[in-house]
């Protein structure tokens, strides 16, 4: 098994890492408005959450360049079954200005930590939109987003946005990434298929999906 424990957060398969805030800041213009080569999904979830993602290989490369320069894959390489390199499946912005109630869910379910999510804020003021998560004992705790720091999590990490409201939308940079072996793709795709209109598979090929809230996010044991 490739699972690990964060003793500080008292939760499994989650870590916090430093990130280069100057690279993260490159995405501020995209957060402020739409641009050619991008598309959006609005899953609801007790909020006005928007996933703004690349719709072409060229715009995907913008996120991939940041992913590589930030060396995000290095933090989880030891847990992945790799042939050559850590693969970025999707990069996008998570944008919201209100959330009325928690929506606990899992990003990854029974993938044996072959896929991970990274989240980091684009600005220092997240207006209370922090990350709620469930500890191993079932208690709900809060992780406060910090500029220059990212949270990375894998399998069975139950979490939600903390309810809040902001006059100006708050944006997070998100990467979803993991193994470059196709043998794991079926379980990975079962979770993320539909979150973005385009995904890059472990083998490097691009594929189109139908935008919708990923069905894996509604796993019954997500809380």
What spans do the regions from the language model cover?
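Double-stranded beta-helix
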Residues: 175-216, 221
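Short N-terminal helix-initiation segments at or just after the protein's N-terminus
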Residues: 53-67, 116-126, 195-200
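Intrinsically disordered, low-complexity, compositionally biased regions/tails
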Residues: 17, 37, 41, 48, ...
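Short coil/loop linkers at secondary-structure junctions
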Residues: 81-83, 218
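Non-heme Fe(II)/2-oxoglutarate
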Residues: 1-80
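Catalytic core of non-heme Fe(II) oxygenases with the double-stranded beta-helix
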Residues: 84-89, 95-162, 169-172, 176-194
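Short, surface-exposed loop and linker segments with low hydrophobicity and enrichment for Pro/Ser/Thr
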Residues: 61, 168-169
């Amino acid at each position: 098994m490739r699972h690990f424990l964060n003793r500080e957060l008292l939760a499994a398969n989650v870590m916090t890492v430093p990130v280069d805030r100057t690279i993260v800041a490159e995405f501020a213009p995209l957060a402020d408005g739409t641009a050619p080569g991008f598309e959006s999904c609005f899953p609801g979830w007790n909020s006005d959450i928007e996933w703004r993602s690349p719709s072409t290989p060229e715009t995907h490369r913008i996120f991939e360049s940041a992913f590589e320069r930030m060396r995000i894959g290095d933090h989880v390489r030891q847990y992945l079954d790799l042939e050559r390199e850590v693969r970025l499946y999707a990069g996008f912005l998570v944008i919201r200005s209100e959330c009325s109630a928690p929506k606990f869910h899992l990003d990854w379910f029974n993938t044996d930590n072959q896929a991970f999510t990274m989240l980091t804020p684009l600005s220092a003021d997240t207006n209370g939109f922090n990350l709620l998560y469930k500890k191993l004992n079932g208690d709900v705790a809060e992780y406060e987003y910090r500029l220059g720091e990212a949270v990375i999590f894998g399998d069975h990490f139950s979490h939600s946005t903390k309810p809040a409201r902001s006059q100006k939308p708050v944006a997070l940079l998100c990467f979803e990434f993991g193994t470059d072996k196709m043998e794991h793709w079926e379980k990975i795709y079962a979770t993320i298929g539909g979150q973005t209109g385009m995904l890059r598979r472990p083998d490097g090929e691009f594929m189109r999906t139908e935008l919708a809230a990923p069905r894996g996010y509604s796993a019954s044991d997500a809380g």
